[in-house]
Amino acid sequence: MGLNIGLRLWLPQDRFSGVPWLLPGIELLLLVALLAADPGRVASRASRTRAHRVVILLVVLLVVGALLVTALLIDNLITGAKVTQAPGPLLAAGALVWLGNNLAFGMLYWLMDSGGPMMRARQPRQIDFAFTQQLSPELAPPGWRPVFLDYLHLGFTNATAFSPTDVMPLTHRAKYAMLVQSTVALALVGLVVARAVNAFT
């Protein structure tokens, strides 16, 4: 989460419209609140529920922020803003936005699947994503459960292949989320690469 916030701050803020510190500042405050109310250190069920709500709010803000930054970059590409004139800054901004999107959606998948990590630890009945190790238990160690790295890998492969690879979405919400991510990634990569090639020539 901290890495995603940092990526936003590395973007060329003077070339993007809006208040550059607003969304990262809100996300940072929520991250501090989450660390202060770590559900692994509190015994009260009500406190764990509050911490879980903070996590949900933080991840939703990260995803919304990723989509807003993508929309701003696409708008700059269409209107021919200064950031899109030189291929170097354009490719750097595009790479940072693409990476931030993948991190945000990886966290969304991690939080979405089976109701989140705490519910997954209780052997959930309904899963949102089917991993290879779940479909073929003989390929996995006993008691295998997906961890954040598995969802981060899902986010990167979905943004790169624009389709499911080794993890299948099973529920409507999982399919909608992957559809949004792959569509945004396709638009971002297509426009950035096309503009960069045009700037080189």
Give, region by region, the residue ranges found by the protein language model.
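Hydrophobic alpha-helical transmembrane segments of multi-pass integral membrane proteins
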Residues: 1-5, 27-34, 56-73, 96, ...
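Structural signature of hydrophobic alpha-helical transmembrane segments
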Residues: 17-31
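Pore-domain transmembrane helices of cation channels
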Residues: 77-118
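Pore domain of cation channels
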Residues: 145-201
